[in-house]
């Protein structure tokens, strides 16, 4: 690793199951609990919240959009997995190319993946020729500066590359690293694969990480593609299961989430159970967003948006929205105006019905 060095999703939905403590998987039942003017930031109502049914198409014809990060003015930077482009999307739908990230090797589920902003830096995670890595570039609002590698050596594969990155309230960078199609790596603390990693903005290992000298924050993960912090600083993660259960997990430092020894709720004291689980045909979860005591989880194979009340760190009964209306949903992100932006993902080669004439799109969803 520099600073620090160190899969595939089925297509079908199921219902979450409540638990105590997440992955990507095949078919089963429904989850159980164990373009407008530039928006002005508003004071949101108390949560939990849910979609109002007011959905606007912000922009169309994107090429495999994977992640987005909002700027203060309500516009967003969007990554395209296969083209390696970063594009600026205005709330009124105006689209501008900011630049192309050099060194991206797009194949299978790999390519230009997660994006995050921190101070004057723009961070992205991508698949390179020999590994997955996190880099940063200075961003002046119009163009990208020189690329600096901060984490490298994360195992890559045609599937299970993880890819989501997010800064926590502690100022540290959290990285979802997939198992790169080798489940044994998830239990190997000497490998960064199958983990959630935590590093400083420069890519160094923080002194207070749970394993001395290691970027590993939690382990036993198959393919984490959603990361979000709630108002209390708790970290939530969505994870693809294999053939049985997809998961929503509440992440604790140093804990083992079980893959590949267990999938879903195991009630085994050796592992942390997911907070909720879904059969893989109802979820195949990717990006998640937190808004007012609520987690919103985008479903790829499930082709729906899950709304999950999470008051006090516990999960209520999930509810599905937009089932099949927009196809595969890659990511959900809370906008500065209090709405939710959704990325569709029907141009990624995995859609059962193929892309529609306007795919891929960004949708703006009102919340109440």
Predicted segments — roles?
Residues 1-2:
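Sec-dependent bacterial lipoprotein signal peptides
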């Amino acid at each position: 690793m520099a600073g620090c060095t160190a899969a595939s999703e089925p297509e079908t939905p199921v219902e979450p199951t409540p638990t105590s403590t997440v992955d990507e998987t095949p078919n089963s039942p429904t989850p159980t609990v164990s373009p407008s003017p530039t928006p002005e930031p508003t004071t949101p109502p108390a949560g939990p919240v849910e979609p109002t049914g007011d959905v606007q198409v912000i922009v169309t014809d994107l090429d495999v959009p994977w992640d987005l990060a909002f700027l203060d003015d309500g516009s967003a930077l969007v990554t395209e997995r296969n083209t390696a482009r970063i594009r600026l999307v205005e709330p009124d739908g105006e689209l501008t190319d900011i630049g192309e990230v050099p060194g991206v090797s797009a194949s299978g589920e790999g390519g230009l993946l997660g994006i995050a902003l921190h101070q004057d830096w723009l961070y992205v995670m991508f698949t390179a020729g020999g590994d997955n890595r996190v880099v940063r570039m200075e961003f002046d609002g119009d163009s990208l500066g020189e690329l600096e590698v901060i984490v490298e050596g994360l195992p890559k594969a045609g599937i299970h590359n993880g890819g989501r990155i997010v800064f926590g309230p502690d100022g540290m960078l959290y990285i979802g690293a997939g198992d790169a199609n080798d489940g044994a790596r998830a239990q190997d603390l000497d490998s960064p694969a199958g983990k959630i990693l935590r590093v400083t903005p420069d890519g160094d290992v923080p002194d207070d990480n749970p394993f001395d000298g290691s970027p590993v924050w939690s382990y036993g993960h198959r393919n984490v593609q959603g990361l979000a912090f709630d108002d209390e600083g708790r970290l939530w993660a969505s994870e693809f299961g294999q053939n049985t259960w997809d998961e929503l997990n509440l992440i604790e430092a140093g804990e083992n989430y079980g893959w590949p020894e267990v999938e879903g709720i195991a009630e085994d004291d050796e592992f942390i159970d997911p907070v909720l689980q879904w059969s893989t045909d109802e979820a195949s979860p990717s990006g998640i967003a937190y808004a007012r005591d609520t987690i919103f989880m985008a479903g790829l194979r499930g082709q729906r948006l899950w709304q999950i009340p999470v008051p006090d760190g516990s999960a209520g009964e999930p509810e599905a929205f937009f089932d099949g209306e927009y196809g595969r949903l890659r990511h959900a992100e809370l906008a500065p105006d209090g709405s939710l932006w959704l990325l569709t993902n029907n141009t990624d080669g995995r859609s059962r019905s193929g892309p529609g004439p306007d795919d891929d799109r960004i949708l703006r969803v009102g919340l109440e």
